[in-house]
Amino acid sequence: MSYFLSYCKAHGGALLTGYQALRAEGFLCDVTLETEGSEFPAHRSLLACSSDYFRALFKSHTQESRARVIHLHVPSAAGLQRLLDFIYTAWLSLSMDTVEDTLEAASYLQVTEALGLCGRYLERQLAPENCCFAANVAARFGLAHTLDAAERCIVSHLQELLARGAGPAGLLELNPTSLRAVLGAPDVARVPEARLLGLALAWLRQEPTTERLAHCTELLERVRFGLVPADVLRRVYSGSGLVLPARVKGLIIQALNYHTTPSRQPLMQGEQTSIRSPQTRILLVGGRRAREVVIEEVAAPQRAARGQVAAPEPEEEEEELEEEEEEEEWELTQNVVAFDVYNHRWRSLTQLPTPLLGHSVCTAGNFLFVLGGESPSGSASSPLADDSRVVTAQVHRYDPRFHAWTEVPAMREARAHFWCGAVGERLLAVGGLGAGGEVLASVEMYDLRRDRWTAAGALPRALHGHAGAVGDRGVVYISGGKAGRGEGGASSLRDLYVLGPEEQVWSKKAPMGTARFGHHMAVLRGAVFAFLGRYEPFSEIERYDPGADQWTRLRPLPYDRFCYGLAVVEETALLLGGLKWRDSRQVPTRNVVGYDLDLDRWEDIGCALPWAWSGLRCAVLQLAEGGDDEREGEVGEALDLVLG
């Protein structure tokens, strides 16, 4: 004898269809639901199967459980009608006008499937014009997933909502939980922090004020006061019209102390001073560039059909660049350009205080420091006279939080073609060419905490055109360069010098396999890499193992280059722009190549600099998303909001 089990997919639907027919006929209806004067005949069995409320009610031994008419405290008869239609048909009719009433009924009667459908409907309908409403509804009815989606929608469209006005956009009616989430979101983009502070203060001033002020601390502590201008902070502290809790006052005082000690700011970084929605960008700073029109934002050249057409061979590319060089005119530049290495886009970020060549850059606490270099002896408006440059000792610092330059105390000696780096709480400036063209062995150190330069242990010999890097535990490496004056004054060197964090005397280590000048170094996974410089016919790359004191030759770059910029992003060394030799001539190269550490392989990443550029210096910073034009009016608008 054989047995089998069959399943009918249509049975469930047929059962509901039968119940709906009975309901339409009023046949076998054994209970009537009443609200707002409207009555709805129904079947106890189906109600108990669909609603936790009715299941518990009908199981209880109370007079109401046996009553023919049950009075419900559902605020909307229309909402109850839609919910009963769902129970009998599995279809729920929803719109933004009816979803709240439907949720009222579903929540009261504990119809969990209807609650889930309403939540998913709100998520699918999310848009800037309704995201605040959706967040309030989701918070009211405990729809956690929908609430999270609505809050993310508010965060992503906050700039647009604030542009429409906090009141009309619904931000001032937002529930406190959602507002707290928005103010604390790390990925708020294109909204100055002062506007977030103004939004919080405007919300707290709304009626009922007493009830809202109970949320003052939990809201305002989410504002990053270190990103708010000092003038705004002072007005908030003394003239906001609100009684600020001690916790908030403490945060404001802490931020004011941050603003009044600029030299220590790189050492005072934390959540209160961290940029929201940070974007990793490579900054290309100064040097010489072709005299072309600056393009605000340049998309990288893309291969046709997403790579279906092969890129030109290196020889063809060099020939094209050589032809361009015939008409190339160079000038010293003040440009600082931000490069999005992930999306291959360029954006003009800011301008150096003066055009520079032979300068050095480093970062500390997400600040960019630009040190020394050669600048025009005349006005900055005539930057192309290569024979009238002076070596400077000036140091400038760029703050991406406020898009502002600050002058730092100048170095003890003017320097060009030197190396600088951040070591702990100090900046180190090593060697270079002095104001009179002399080659320097001196080393000086800038103490960020004390805001002054002091002499440090000098190099064993004077050097310029050398490279440097900071390794693990703050060990400084200096390699190559020349000891003589001018490019032809001496041969390139192979020497490697090392300075430990607590040492005053440089140690000489194993020399490089190739003499180098005007090259670059970088530390990747604890190893020190030396990349090619000028007059290197074989384009060889080397890796130094500090533990073994040994150099290893790696795969050479497919084609030579010099006067390029170097940056390291996610353990990938990127070489940007520069010059190369072609038929005994210097020609520009605008491409960007990356070194794959695991495969010991070079790869052209498929984008070009916005113009021919040499002598540039590169650094990696976290920048706020958006352009500088969005910062205009920040202080004035924020003060208006602070004063109500």
UniProtKB/Swiss-Prot annotation:
Residues 313-329 have a biased composition (Acidic residues). It comes from the Eukaryota. Residues 304-329 are annotated as: Disordered. Keywords: Kelch repeat, Repeat. Residues 131-238 form the BACK domain. PROSITE patterns: BTB (PS50097). Kelch repeats lie at residues 320-366, 367-425, 426-473, 475-526, 528-571, 573-623. Gene3D superfamilies: 1.25.40.420, Kelch-type beta propeller (2.120.10.80), Potassium Channel Kv1.1, Chain A (3.30.710.10). Pfam families: BACK (PF07707), BTB (PF00651), Kelch_KLHDC2_KLHL20_DRC7 (PF24681). SMART domains: BACK (SM00875), BTB (SM00225), Kelch (SM00612). One of its GO terms (cellular component) is extracellular space. InterPro entries: BACK (IPR011705), BTB-kelch_protein (IPR017096), BTB/POZ_dom (IPR000210), Kelch-typ_b-propeller (IPR015915), Kelch_1 (IPR006652), SKP1/BTB/POZ_sf (IPR011333). Residues 29-96 form the BTB domain. This is Kelch-like protein 34. The gene is KLHL34.
